[in-house]
């Protein structure tokens, strides 16, 4: 009976037939073929003096022995006379196809590959064959350690590839299209698409691939298949790498940290993009005006300003925008949605850029320094604007009158003088203004008029108190909620003699002041700390001559001040040289003032 080979029992598909199978069918095919291969491997083993049941349960061990036999056969045919190292257990994996890059084969070793059955399951063991004695290799510690994600590697080439992934270095370029890659193997895989020699060709675009896995991944672009689904939010992705990066938005993991400013990122692409900001590198240039950008996406958005191609149009106001992010931010202006909230002060924003700019106010971070004067700024745009004060550059010019400006925002504001646009409208009277400063000045005038008329539009729903302006009303509301947003960072400061909460001090206006003469005899709304000051009027003033000798109702601190009349004053001319009957009040007050 002839021996059974793997090709006799294997089921082979053509490229067209394979493309018709779905994911579950392809997975089932692989499992069946692997199981068949394991069974054939175990049948081809010599069973003399061995436990058959044990050997059947360990097909990997059988496969290893079979490969050793093949290697020994090839070893006998080699011409250099060297001995070779067998493949260790941990390197024999059915799905492992990578060879160890550290071991070099002999020049006269003409083995090529060890083929077992179908080429789909062939294993390249050239990398695991070395010029050493016939003994097992001990795979010890991993000497190459990557500093950024704290990952260790056994071989230096793998370490260098990982290192380039962080630094963004891509020394290998495609000669046809100029695209750069981290490794030589990536260039070779890429060149297959240009040559069209790959065994797997895409039906939709004609691209060729040398690997079935890459072909199937590429196919998802055309079919729209997204097998990788996020369990937390349900969002699906075409690629597992994109899915892994998305999962970090839920976990908050940011493994790529830039050492210069300490900012961390979810993906290496975001890390490299941020690195270009610090380096000042702008590799992507507009072909029409020559303006350079750090990211190719920004170039595409900028090119729409030349072609006047606005893809996104607002249905409410008709305004057209060139980018999706700008359009989404604009829509929030109409809806009032502000999804980005500051955790420190509670202020919310409609765009992520505005939110990030605001965050730097709390952190005090100013990573951008002017090289000429040393002044630091929290944003790169602020630094660029400041540098123009040194150079005198005014790149933004008005097309109608020719006037030039340092920033685009100043040019937009100036353009309203020509168009007559007045975007800032008063909510109370409907009057419109060209500048926001004019609107604020107008609102202050309206508040001032109400003070004279006595009108109080803003009333508290809890206590019914009325206010002239909305800001005073908002401050008052915090007294009911107990909200205190502003906290003193220096906790070692000596407290005042009379500790008064900030919300009580806000009520110290002239109309409710206990010092005012018109409020004499009226009950004060302030706390007990100021109850003693109600009596500080002219008729009960302890410093007045008419009150000399009368008992004071002030606290113990001011008891010694009762004797401070003109006739008994130690500063009076008639009392010069006379011993004062006052205690050391001033020494006490002087020392208290310094503390």
Curated annotation (Swiss-Prot):
- Give a single Pfam family match: zf-C2H2_4
A GO cellular component annotated for this chain's UniProt record is: nucleus
Official protein name in the record: Zinc finger protein 440
Q: Does the keyword Transmembrane apply?
A: no
Family classification: Belongs to the krueppel C2H2-type zinc-finger protein family.
Answer yes or no on keyword Protease.
Answer: no
Q: Report the gene name.
A: ZNF440
Q: What is the lineage of its organism?
A: Eukaryota, Metazoa, Chordata, Craniata, Vertebrata
Q: Which organism is it from?
A: Homo sapiens
KRAB domain span? 4-86
MF terms in GO: DNA-binding transcription factor activity, RNA polymerase II-specific; RNA polymerase II transcription regulatory region sequence-specific DNA binding; zinc ion binding
Q: Which keywords accompany this UniProt record?
A: DNA-binding, Metal-binding, Nucleus, Repeat, Transcription, Transcription regulation, Zinc, Zinc-finger
Signal peptide boundaries: none
> Main role?
May be involved in transcriptional regulation.
Q: Which biological process, per GO, is one annotated for this protein?
A: regulation of transcription by RNA polymerase II
| SMART domains linked to this entry | KRAB, ZnF_C2H2
């Amino acid at each position: 009976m002839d021996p059974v080979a793997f090709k006799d029992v294997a089921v082979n598909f053509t490229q067209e037939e394979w493309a018709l199978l779905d994911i579950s069918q392809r997975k089932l095919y692989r499992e069946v073929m692997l199981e068949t291969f394991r069974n054939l491997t175990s049948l081809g083993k010599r069973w003399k003096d061995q436990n058959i049941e044990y050997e059947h349960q360990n097909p990997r061990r059988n496969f290893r022995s079979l490969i050793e036999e093949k290697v020994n056969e090839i070893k006998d045919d080699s011409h250099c006379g060297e001995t070779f190292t067998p493949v260790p257990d941990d390197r024999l994996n059915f799905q492992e196809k990578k060879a160890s890059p550290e071991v070099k084969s002999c020049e006269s070793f003409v083995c090529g590959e060890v083929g077992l059955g179908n080429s789909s399951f062939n294993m390249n063991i050239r990398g695991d064959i070395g010029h050493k004695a016939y003994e097992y290799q001990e795979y010890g510690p991993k000497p190459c350690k990557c500093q950024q994600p704290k990952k260790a590697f056994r071989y230096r080439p793998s370490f260098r590839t990982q290192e380039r992934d962080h630094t963004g270095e891509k020394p290998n370029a495609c000669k046809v299209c100029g695209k750069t890659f981290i490794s030589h193997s990536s260039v070779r895989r890429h060149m297959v698409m240009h040559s069209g020699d790959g065994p797997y060709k895409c039906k939709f675009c004609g691209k060729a691939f040398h690997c079935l896995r890459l072909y199937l991944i590429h196919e998802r672009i055309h079919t729209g298949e997204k097998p990788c689904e996020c369990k937390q939010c349900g969002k699906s992705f075409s690629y597992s790498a994109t899915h892994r990066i998305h999962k970090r938005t839920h976990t908050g993991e940011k493994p790529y940290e830039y050492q210069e400013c300490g900012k961390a990122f979810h993906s290496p692409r975001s890390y490299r993009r941020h690195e270009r900001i610090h380096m000042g590198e702008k590799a992507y240039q507009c072909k029409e005006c020559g303006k350079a950008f750090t990211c190719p996406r920004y170039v595409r958005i900028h090119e729409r300003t030349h072609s006047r191609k606005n893809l996104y149009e607002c249905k409410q106001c008709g305004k057209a925008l060139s980018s999706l992010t700008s359009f989404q931010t604009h829509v929030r202006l109409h809806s009032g949605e502000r999804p980005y909230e500051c955790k420190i002060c509670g202020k919310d924003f409609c765009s992520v850029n505005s939110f990030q700019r605001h965050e730097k106010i709390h952190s005090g971070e100013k990573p951008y320094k002017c090289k000429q004067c040393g002044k630091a700024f929290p944003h790169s745009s602020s630094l660029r604007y400041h540098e123009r004060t040194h150079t005198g550059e005014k790149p933004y010019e008005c097309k109608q009158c020719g006037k030039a400006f340092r920033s685009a925002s100043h040019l937009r504001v100036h353009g309203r003088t020509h168009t007559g646009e007045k975007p800032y409208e008063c909510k109370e009277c409907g009057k419109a203004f060209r500048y926001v400063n004019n609107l604020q000045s107008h609102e202050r005038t309206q508040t001032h008029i109400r003070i004279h008329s006595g009108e109080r539009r803003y009333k508290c729903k809890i206590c019914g108190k009325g206010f002239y302006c909305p800001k005073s009303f908002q401050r008052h509301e915090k007294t009911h909620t107990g909200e205190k947003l502003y906290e003193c960072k220096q906790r070692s400061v000596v407290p005042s003699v009379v500790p008064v909460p900030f919300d009580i001090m806000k009520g110290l206006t002239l109309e409710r002041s206990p010092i005012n003469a018109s409020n004499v005899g009226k009950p004060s709304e302030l706390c007990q700390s100021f109850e003693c000051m109600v009596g500080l009027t002219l008729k009960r003033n302890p410093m007045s001559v008419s009150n000399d000798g009368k008992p004071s109702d002030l606290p113990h601190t001011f008891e010694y001040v009762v004797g401070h009349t003109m006739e008994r004053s130690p500063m009076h001319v008639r009392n010069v040289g006379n011993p004062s009957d006052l205690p050391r009040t001033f020494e006490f007050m002087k020392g208290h003032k310094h503390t």
